[in-house]
């Protein structure tokens, strides 16, 4: 059996290298100086991986672009926040690689009706969400197909969204004067260098992830992934990849919130991944790590190459994804449960109606 998920993960360093320059050019095309300076508050939204990318890039927009930013899931934004947007300076980025997710389309549409300037990060200018916004940032980086036609958990699409968000944050920062031209170039070079960091992380983490998958193969209960700041987005994303790849119950949690909630969970040896960038999150991660050990958790920290926290999701997500890929292969578990048991990939997500849900005006 070919490990298609692992094969996709192995392509991520080259993907970063391939899209870095064209995505920077795309950000430059959309965000001119006047547009960038007009941003009073930025809202980023999406569903699933796209929502996690919004969370993972929030720090970049605040730190590099100097823009107050809120990352929200599409349901919350569309049905609750869109009615109360600022009357001036609201800019809204909807993230949807497929471009067909109803709730995200609804969110940017409702924001536009209320005077916000709207954007889509999507795979082409012809997707449904592209038709619903004023500006389109195209991320032409589809998941690698395979001859077997297997639906594989998405990693390339997530990385493409992150790269476009990071490129946009840097360029907006330069246009607003939050970054000098020299500083912007330094940050672009730092972002490009994550390709090497990702490759080094794969080399370090792949054997360890495989060994961990073998050692925990009989474990049948929850898996927990913890992170903070950008890596809270990573934690949510990695839990999603576990669910998709293996079907195991998995959750992403903020490091601080773990101490308030999962600390009291009954089961002792729960595999608990601590995903730390070693910067703003470092002191609290160390405290919580001690608490995890004290109550018998199986604390997991797979090896990775260091990376600035603002771009850490491009590196930190790789080791847990490799673990999920290896576990699925060892279990012989079909991705997405093969869309069986009442699940369906047809008709816009089957009964879940991801793409056919009724849209609110």
Predicted regions and their residues:
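Active-site phosphate/pyrophosphate-binding segments
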Residues: 3-40, 135-137, 143-270, 333-361
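Glycine-rich phosphate-binding loops that contact phosphosugars or nucleotide phosphates
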Residues: 25-28, 37-193, 228, 263-264, ...
């Amino acid at each position: 059996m070919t490990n298609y998920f692992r094969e996709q993960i192995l392509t991520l360093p080259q993907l970063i290298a391939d899209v870095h320059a064209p995505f920077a050019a795309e950000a430059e095309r959309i965000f001119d100086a006047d547009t960038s300076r007009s941003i009073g508050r930025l809202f980023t939204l999406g569903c699933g991986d796209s929502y996690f990318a919004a969370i993972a890039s929030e720090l970049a927009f605040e730190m590099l672009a100097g823009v107050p930013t809120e990352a929200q899931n599409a349901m919350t934004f569309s049905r609750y926040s869109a009615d109360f947007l600022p009357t001036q300076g609201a800019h809204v980025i909807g993230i949807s690689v497929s471009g067909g997710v109803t709730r995200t389309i609804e969110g940017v549409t409702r924001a536009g009706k209320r005077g916000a300037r709207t954007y889509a990060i999507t795979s082409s200018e012809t997707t449904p969400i592209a038709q619903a916004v004023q500006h389109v940032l195209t991320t032409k980086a589809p998941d690698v197909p395979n001859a077997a036609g297997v639906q594989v958990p998405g990693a390339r699409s997530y990385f493409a969204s992150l790269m476009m968000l990071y490129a946009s944050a840097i360029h907006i920062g330069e246009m607003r004067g939050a970054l000098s031209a020299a500083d912007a170039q330094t940050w672009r070079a730092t972002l490009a260098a994550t390709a090497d960091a990702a490759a080094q992380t794969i080399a370090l983490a792949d054997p360890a992830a495989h060994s961990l998958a073998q050692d925990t193969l009989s474990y049948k209960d929850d898996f927990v992934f913890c992170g903070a700041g950008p890596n809270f987005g990573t934690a949510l994303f990695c839990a999603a990849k576990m669910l998709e790849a293996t079907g195991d119950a998995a959750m992403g949690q903020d490091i601080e919130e773990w101490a308030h909630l999962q600390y009291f969970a009954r089961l002792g040896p729960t595999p608990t991944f601590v995903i730390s960038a070693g910067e703003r999150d470092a002191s609290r991660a160390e405290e919580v790590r001690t608490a995890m050990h004290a109550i018998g958790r199986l604390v997991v920290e797979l090896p990775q190459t260091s990376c600035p926290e603002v771009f850490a999701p491009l590196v930190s997500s790789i080791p847990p994804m490799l673990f999920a890929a290896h576990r699925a292969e060892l279990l012989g578990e079909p991705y997405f449960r093969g869309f069986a048991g009442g699940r369906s990939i047809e008709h816009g997500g089957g009964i879940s109606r991801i793409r056919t849900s009724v849209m609110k005006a």
